[in-house]
């Protein structure tokens, strides 16, 4: 209802400000291929992203298993609730909303993801994604095949540590959000 619309409107303003801060616009990916680095070492989001603290060897290994699909236009799904889990994703530009529908068909927003943030982790340990992931703006992403990523762990402990740290941060942020909601409800 109204809360969801206001939240999306506020999020879109945040995205516009974030994209402006990074100098990002969807046309950069279509008309300026030099900004569309095909490896983590050359990516303009490097310092805001998962590979930020990786050494060159680990960053190269991660780059080799990262796909760069064409940008998703506003409203397009990156994946749908209950679709087979295959990859985790990092936003390069735009914004992604994750949400699910309950048994009654009511939508529940679970997150908004901005450039440099990881999503798709809702499928880890399962065979399918729990949520829908939808582009709210023209959105470019990096897709990391999760099975291949797991196969790198024994050889690149640093990658495993960074992914684990990112997952822990995501859990912490969700806990903080729940605490904030509970505090607001109590007031």
Residue ranges and their predicted role:
Residues 11-74, 118-119, 123-124, 155:
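Cyclic nucleotide-binding regulatory module and flanking cytosolic helices
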Residues 75, 86-99, 115-116:
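Glycine- and acidic-residue-biased ligand/ion/polar-headgroup-sensing regions
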Residues 78-83:
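Short phosphate-coordinating micro-motif centered on Lys-Gly-acidic
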Residues 97-108:
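A short beta-strand-loop-beta hairpin characteristic of the jelly-roll/cupin
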Residues 109-173:
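Cyclic-nucleotide recognition modules
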Residues 179-186:
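N-terminal positioning helix adjacent to the helix-turn-helix/winged-helix DNA-binding module
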């Amino acid at each position: 209802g109204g809360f969801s619309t206001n939240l999306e409107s506020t999020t879109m303003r945040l995205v516009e400000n974030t994209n402006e801060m990074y100098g990002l616009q969807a046309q950069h990916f279509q008309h300026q291929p030099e900004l569309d680095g095909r490896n983590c070492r050359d990516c303009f989001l490097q310092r805001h992203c998962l590979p930020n603290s990786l050494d060159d060897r680990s960053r190269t290994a991660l780059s080799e298993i990262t796909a760069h699909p064409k940008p998703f236009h506003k409203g397009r799904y990156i994946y749908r609730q209950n679709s087979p889990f295959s990859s985790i994703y990092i936003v390069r530009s735009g914004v992604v909303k994750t949400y699910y529908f309950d048994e009654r068909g009511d939508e529940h927003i679970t997150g908004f993801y901005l450039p440099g943030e990881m999503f798709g982790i809702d499928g880890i340990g399962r065979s399918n994604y729990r949520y829908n992931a939808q582009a709210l703006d023209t959105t470019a992403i990096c897709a990391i095949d999760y099975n291949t990523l797991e196969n790198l762990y024994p050889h690149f402990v640093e990658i495993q540590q960074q992914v684990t740290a990112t997952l822990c941060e995501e859990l912490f942020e969700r806990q903080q959000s729940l605490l904030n909601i509970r505090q607001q409800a109590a007031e």
